[in-house]
Regions:
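Active-site pre-lysine segment of PLP-dependent enzymes
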Residues: 1-21
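Short, ordered loop/turn segments at secondary-structure junctions
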Residues: 42, 62, 143-145
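Conserved PLP-dependent catalytic core of the aminotransferase class-I/II
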Residues: 63-110, 114-137
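PLP-dependent enzyme catalytic core of the Aspartate aminotransferase-like
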Residues: 133-134, 145-201
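Active-site PLP attachment segment
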Residues: 14-47
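Short acidic, glycine/serine/threonine-rich loops at helix termini
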Residues: 1-7, 34-37, 151
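Short hydrophobic/aromatic beta-strand micro-patches
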Residues: 38, 115-117, 156-158
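A short glycine-threonine-serine/GTX helix/turn-capping micro-motif
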Residues: 52-61, 79
Length: 201
């Protein structure tokens, strides 16, 4: 989904023909399952065929999944695909900018997946519980997928999102952050009060 021709960062850097092994997923741009491995020579292909655990324990794509991938690839290579990538990157940059303006910590480089740092697992879970109340939806990622104490949301941006959609989710996240943080402080205070009460007996 990245770059003018949709060939990703490796295509943008002009390295596609120089890479010995290229691996890609069908779960994002292609909205399917599985992925691919492309190699330069038959020796690498044979090695991966026999010694790559992901290949050994996988199955072939179904015909329906393969047809979906091919249909998506046709769009990627078309003028429609180019226009959608431009809209997508515009939305990515707009979301990152609006999140930052709202005082939220955005991680990583611009891509269709926008991570927003929450901090502790406790706060992350409370904010995740609050977010749908305010009209937002995001994937919570926490330890062990990320370092302990560094939980985050992963927002997935689409070309079809409008700036109004993005404004709404930024507003929802800011409200959920306030509510979740207040709830975490309240739980912490209650715990301290209970501890003091037990100590007094």
């Amino acid at each position: 989904s990245m770059g003018a021709d949709g060939k990703g960062n490796i295509g943008r850097s002009g390295m596609l023909d120089q890479a010995d092994i290229v691996i890609g997923s069908f779960s994002k741009t292609f909205a399917s399952n599985g992925g691919f491995v492309s190699v330069k020579d038959t020796y690498a292909a044979e090695y991966l065929r026999y010694y790559s655990a992901p290949h050994t324990f996988t199955n072939a794509l179904s015909p329906v999944q393969a047809a979906g991938v091919l249909a998506a690839l046709e769009i990627v290579r078309s003028e429609e695909g180019r226009a959608r990538r431009e809209r997508l990157m515009d939305n990515v940059l707009y979301l990152r900018n609006e999140m930052t303006k709202a005082g939220l910590e955005v991680l990583g480089e611009p891509s269709p997946i926008v991570p927003v740092r929450l901090g502790s697992e406790a706060v992350g879970r409370l904010v995740a519980r609050q977010l749908p109340r305010f009209g937002g939806l995001a994937n919570l990622v926490e330890y062990p997928a990320v370092p302990r104490g560094d939980s985050r949301f992963r927002f997935q941006v689409m070309a079809d999102h409008t700036h109004e959609d993005i404004d709404a989710v930024v507003k929802a996240l800011a409200a959920a952050m306030r509510a979740g943080t207040q709830e975490a402080l309240s739980i912490e205070r209650d715990g301290d009060n209970n501890a003091h009460g037990r100590a007094g007996h």
